[in-house]
Design a protein with these regions (language model features):
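HIT superfamily nucleotide-processing domains
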Residues: 1-151
Length: 151
């Protein structure tokens, strides 16, 4: 991608320079699931935002075996249902990019009636303030962990 030189991009894609692989795990882990780490942050773009980060390095969905792809989708299905129930979101949006960090990860954006981006996609460059009030994120995190441990 334009941010990276060709050499840097190849090293990122191979996992050699992947910041997630180099640190061993992604930042903000809420839970470890079958194929992914579930992450979130109090500085998320939307209340209830989560990200599923593949445990092993892969860049594209086609890099996964059929079994890995099924496990990834099961993690996504499980988390998305729980996030929707916890947040009361009217819709969940799912995004896969990888042009900034080429390590397969899936963003989950709960959507709400009257949210700042109700008529379009979420612009994360505009949403810089935490969507959580005092202790709300920690409550969301604990509730999410508790619900995941029930299954």
């Amino acid at each position: 991608m334009s941010k990276w030189s060709s050499t840097e991009w190849k090293a990122l894609c191979s996992g050699e320079a992947c910041p997630i692989c180099l640190s061993g795990k992604p930042f903000g882990i809420v839970a470890e699931l079958n194929a992914t780490y579930l992450t979130s942050s109090p500085n998320s773009p939307m209340r209830g935002y989560c990200c599923l980060v593949l445990k092993r390095h892969a860049v594209e969905l086609y890099d996964l075996s059929a079994d890995e792809a099924c496990l990834l989708m099961r993690d996504l299905q499980r988390v998305s249902k729980i996030v929707q129930e916890i947040t009361g979101a009217v819709k969940l949006n799912y995004e896969i990019h990888g042009n900034t960090i080429p390590h397969l990860h899936l963003h989950l954006f709960p959507r709400y009636k009257g949210d700042p981006f109700e008529d379009g996609s979420i612009n994360t460059k505009v949403t810089r303030q935490s969507p959580y009030g005092d202790k709300e994120f920690e409550s969301f995190r604990r509730t999410l962990q508790a619900r995941l441990s029930e299954d």
